[in-house]
Amino acid sequence: MPSIKSDIEIARAAAKKPIFEIGAKLGIPVEQLVPYGHDKAKVSAEFIAGQAGKKDGKLILVTAINPTPAGEGKTTTTVGLGDGLNRIGKKAIVCIREASLGPCFGVKGGAAGGGFAQVVPMEDINLHFTGDFHAITSAHNLLAAMIDNHIYWGNEENIDIRRITWRRVMDMNDRALRSMVSSLGGVANGFPRQGGFDITVASEVMAILCLATDLTDLERRLGDIIIGYRFDRTPVHARDLKADGAMAVLLKDAMQPNLVQTLENNPAFVHGGPFANIAHGCNSVTATKTALKLGDYVVTEAGFGADLGAEKFFDIKCRKAGLKPDAAVIVATVRALKMNGGVKKDDLGTEDVAALKKGCANLGRHVANVRRFGVPVVVAINHFISDTDAEIAAVKEFVSRLGAEAILCRHWALGSAGIEELAHKVVELAESGQAKFQPLYGDDISLFEKIEIVASKIYHAGEVTADKAVRDQLQTWEEQGYGKLPVCMAKTQYSFSTDPSLRGAPEGHIVTVREVRLSAGAGFVVAITGEIMTMPGLPKSPSAERIFLNEQGYIEGLF
């Protein structure tokens, strides 16, 4: 039996075309592309502005059920579907997020797809790429430095150092930095205070970059950032410290979407990268809107399960950007359904139809949740070698009882040839006119009510609890004019509840909101639930231990 090639081996053997040829497919002139080598480029702001009057293509969201730690192939399916649509004659563009170094060296691995459904250059995309994350980290930490510098030189804004909310960031999983004391070592180093680090993908600057429509909007949003509060409890904004202009300068190039290609030489935008469990989990509005002007179909993904990424895609990204999705694909795997049915991780390769049927309750809830937003749904069964015919048949039968269709997809092994059936179904749904998109809640209800609606309608929680301090903080923000903002739930990705071990489709559980953060620049309120951390830690045996350069200087073990 021939050995199965790793993702990195497949990507390395790709017959890539020069990036200018990929741009030409979309009608992007050579002079409007800023090349980063031969296989990746940024699209100029001038070109993007010139597309404003064009008609939009169809927008397709790819989401998933609650995943196993390794993920269920959502990005792989997004890339495969883009290739599949091109294969059947549609002009399709893939829009995905950039990879964070945290999961790359942690537990999940890369974020460029897998098998024969990848975007390339895979190694670059998973590592430093075009430097966007560096720019975001630098802009975020510039503001942090300017806060402490302002206090050191007299604190003209009367910032209460006990109420500084702006933390520092880095693009790495490092639990040791979650809580720290800075400015120790004497008067020359400033005023000691407690702070900490978040991972870059949880940064409000990341969210701002992904939601801003142009450089003017970017700078306005950066200025709106609240870094803390004065002694009189009034908010201090980044523009009060004159930091917004310099931050925008650092982000000027990062605002331009990155163009790359799939293994089948189809165009893909890879831009922005907020996590969906601790941020809003969607690629940039700029990339999505640009792709909609250039293609007949745009296939994008939102992180983790539909309870997180899809809800935020609909309630934050689509609401803020005026987007109206035409269809949604929910990725399910036999192994994840069995895990949601109670099967242990080590036993997922063994046939267990009974457990799978039990776990299908998780899939059923995700289908119902997406339909709640008025978007038609198809289920993609991402095929794994260990799947049996009986298990696949059980999934198809379950989904058919929901009035939807489940389609077996083999894009990981076969590329676009393995996903043609799904591509045809997506076209059918998108062209049917069934989509009647609407957000889950209106702007005018209270912030706590918005949290309760997401928890009850999407998570099926019986109750939302929060300390008086949390409720009072939400009320204060409402009084300050932030009551119309949507909420961004920070929650475990492994369950509908806040308990990662509670699988399936739990009912009546309690969602505890332990902290809330106002992202005034991004335009949402983050509600942190359960034990979720905005700075992850590395697992006992991180992926980094298995990544190295071989004797030829090639990267091994990345994915």
Curated annotation (Swiss-Prot):
The keyword Transmembrane helix does not apply. It is an enzyme of class 6 (ligase). It comes from the Bacteria. ATP binds at T68, P69, A70, G71, E72, G73, K74, T75. Pathway: One-carbon metabolism; tetrahydrofolate interconversion. Keywords: ATP-binding, Ligase, Nucleotide-binding, One-carbon metabolism. Its EC number is 6.3.4.3. The keyword Transcription does not apply. Belongs to the formate--tetrahydrofolate ligase family. This is Formate--tetrahydrofolate ligase. The gene is fhs.
